């Protein structure tokens, strides 16, 4: 692979360099790899550059060094190595499933990803989910310690799923993952916002920073003409509506007071929740053993996402 095909804005004298792979973990570096030195919360990749070189790295990308050649190793300065990692990963692993869905919010990401996965499976659609529970698809591919995977793992696994003709993939998008550019380079067909509460403020420091991290999904990572799904009852609905309007994203909302999918009746009978909702001027009834109104809303957002993935609403409710 030629560097100029992946980093067109780099110093001209380095454009014709070849590389064979990419890593940000020095232990995973092989011959002629690019090593991207990333400063994390616990480890600084710049401290492992020598290890990466011993393992075969020929190109080092870091925010700490100027462009130079030293001992036959190319050093390239980039302001945001995390962003470079995501963009390179996305370009190297070009093939991706057709329908990419991301779900973000403080609570409910895992539930929605699981509901969506189950709905599509029951409707005989090929589907996979990435998130807290690992990767689920045709089979369990691998587990992970992060809700949102690193960009190389995302790229490799999306490429794998596309080859297996799995066309629908839902990813949990954490605020950490969004702020750290792990999903940069991807464009989503459907984005889901669950809710926001005071969490992870050890990392984000302020609620505003936490919200802005979540909103990266809708501001920067959605396709034109894509679909945003969120709760009309949340106090952040107006912010999301404005973002959708500005970025030409179609919005579909759920809610008890307002919403495209409107909850009209809700009751608990014999430890089951029963509700009536309307959508597209038609009423539907739903019974579920899920507990709590929050889970009902998570389920309804999953139903909307499945419907926008070309499954008829009647078929979804039968499943």
Residue spans for each PLM region:
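N-terminal leader/targeting and accessory segments in enzymes
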Residues: 1-87, 91, 235, 262-265, ...
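Acidic, Mg2+-coordinating active-site environments of NTP-dependent enzymes
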Residues: 3, 62, 66-72, 162-167, ...
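Short gly/ser/thr-rich secondary-structure transition/capping motifs
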Residues: 13-22, 83-86, 149-152, 156, ...
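Conserved beta-strand scaffold positions in the cores of enzyme catalytic domains, especially
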Residues: 75-77, 100, 127-129, 191, ...
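Walker A (P-loop) phosphate-binding motif
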Residues: 89-135, 140
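P-loop NTPase switch/communication element
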Residues: 131-153, 157
């Amino acid at each position: 692979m030629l560097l100029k095909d992946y980093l067109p804005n780099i110093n001209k004298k380095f454009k014709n360099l070849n590389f064979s792979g990419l890593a940000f973990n020095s232990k995973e570096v092989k011959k002629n790899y690019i090593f991207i030195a990333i400063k994390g919360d616990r480890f600084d990749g710049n401290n492992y550059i020598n290890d990466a070189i011993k393992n075969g790295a020929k190109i080092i990308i870091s925010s700490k060094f100027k462009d130079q050649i030293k001992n036959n190793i190319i050093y390239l300065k980039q302001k945001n190595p995390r962003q470079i990692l995501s963009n390179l990963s996305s370009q190297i692993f070009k093939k991706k499933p057709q329908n990419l869905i991301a779900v973000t919010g403080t609570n409910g990401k895992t539930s929605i990803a699981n509901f969506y996965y189950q709905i599509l499976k029951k409707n005989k659609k090929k589907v996979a989910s990435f998130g807290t529970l690992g990767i689920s698809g045709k089979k369990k591919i691998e587990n992970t310690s992060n809700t949102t995977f690193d960009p190389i793992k995302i790229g490799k696994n999306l490429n794998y799923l596309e080859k297996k003709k799995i066309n629908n993939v839902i990813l949990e998008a954490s605020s950490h993952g969004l702020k750290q550019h792990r999903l940069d380079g991807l464009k989503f067909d459907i984005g889901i916002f669950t809710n926001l509460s005071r969490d992870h403020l050890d990392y984000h420091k302020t609620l505003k920073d936490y919200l802005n991290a979540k909103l990266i999904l809708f501001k920067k990572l959605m396709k034109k003409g894509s679909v945003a799904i969120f709760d009309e009852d949340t106090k952040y609905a107006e912010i999301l509506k404005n973002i959708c309007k500005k970025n030409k994203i179609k919005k579909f909302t759920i809610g008890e007071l307002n919403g495209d999918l409107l909850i009209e009746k809700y009751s608990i009978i014999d430890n089951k929740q029963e509700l009536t909702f309307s959508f597209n001027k038609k009423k539907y009834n739903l019974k579920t053993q899920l507990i709590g109104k929050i889970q009902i809303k998570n389920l309804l957002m999953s139903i909307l996402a499945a419907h926008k993935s070309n499954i008829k609403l009647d078929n979804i409710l039968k499943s």
